Amino acid sequence: MTMYIAFILSTIFVIGFVGFSSKPSPIYGGLGLIVSGGVGCGIVLNFGGSFLGLMVFLIYLGGMLVVFGYTTAMATEMYPEVWVSNKTVFGAFVSGLMMEFCMVYYALKEEEVEIIFKFNGLGDWVIYDTGDSGFFSEEAMGIAALYSYGTWLVIVTGWSLLIGVVVIMEITRGN
């Protein structure tokens, strides 16, 4: 059941990026990125990374949502273009969705999928096994290493997010 949930979340993840890559309007492109980011955090949570999924959700969807808000405010249109307003964009979006659904149907129906590389059922989607982690989880050890050995990485990341928000605010403020 867990592998089916991961498979469905991966499909929604790809559909969100198909919606983003068809670029109808900055508002809908930001919506596609937000949906894909939330589903990506759900995938991380599904594989047991509760703290990492929460942090990515808070940082990506909290911090980058500010940037999306300012960029869409800068590029507002009276009549924003949607996916169905342009026949070429709509055709590319529908064909991408149909290819994704055909791939999902083929992978769920067949026991073995071999297109470019070979899958033996949904069990090959498992990335790692946490049975041998002992008393400490791998996630807790990674977080401890990030804040003890990677202090400068955390500081540089925080400053770059702050500078990004300040630059976007200065651009949208006007001349």
UniProtKB/Swiss-Prot annotation:
Keywords: Electron transport, Membrane, Mitochondrion, Mitochondrion inner membrane, NAD, Respiratory chain, Translocase, Transmembrane, Transmembrane helix, Transport, Ubiquinone. Disulfide bonds: none annotated. The keyword Ribonucleoprotein does not apply. It is a multi-pass membrane protein. It comes from the Eukaryota. Gene3D superfamilies: NADH-ubiquinone/plastoquinone oxidoreductase chain 6, subunit NuoJ. It is an enzyme of class 7 (translocase). The chain crosses the membrane at residues 1-21, 25-45, 47-67, 88-108, 149-169. It catalyses: a ubiquinone + NADH + 5 H(+)(in) = a ubiquinol + NAD(+) + 4 H(+)(out). GO terms for biological process: mitochondrial electron transport, NADH to ubiquinone; mitochondrial respiratory chain complex I assembly. InterPro entries: ComplexI_Subunit6, NADH_UbQ/plastoQ_OxRdtase_su6, Nuo/plastoQ_OxRdtase_6_NuoJ. One of its GO terms (molecular function) is NADH dehydrogenase (ubiquinone) activity. GO terms for cellular component: mitochondrial inner membrane; mitochondrion; respiratory chain complex I. It is found in: Mitochondrion inner membrane. Its EC number is 7.1.1.2. Belongs to the complex I subunit 6 family. Core subunit of respiratory chain NADH dehydrogenase (Complex I) which is composed of 45 different subunits. Core subunit of the mitochondrial membrane respiratory chain NADH dehydrogenase (Complex I) which catalyzes electron transfer from NADH through the respiratory chain, using ubiquinone as an electron acceptor. Essential for the catalytic activity and assembly of complex I. PANTHER family: NADH UBIQUINONE OXIDOREDUCTASE SUBUNIT ND6 (PTHR11435), NADH-UBIQUINONE OXIDOREDUCTASE CHAIN 6 (PTHR11435:SF1). This is NADH-ubiquinone oxidoreductase chain 6. The lineage of its organism: Eukaryota, Metazoa, Chordata, Craniata, Vertebrata.
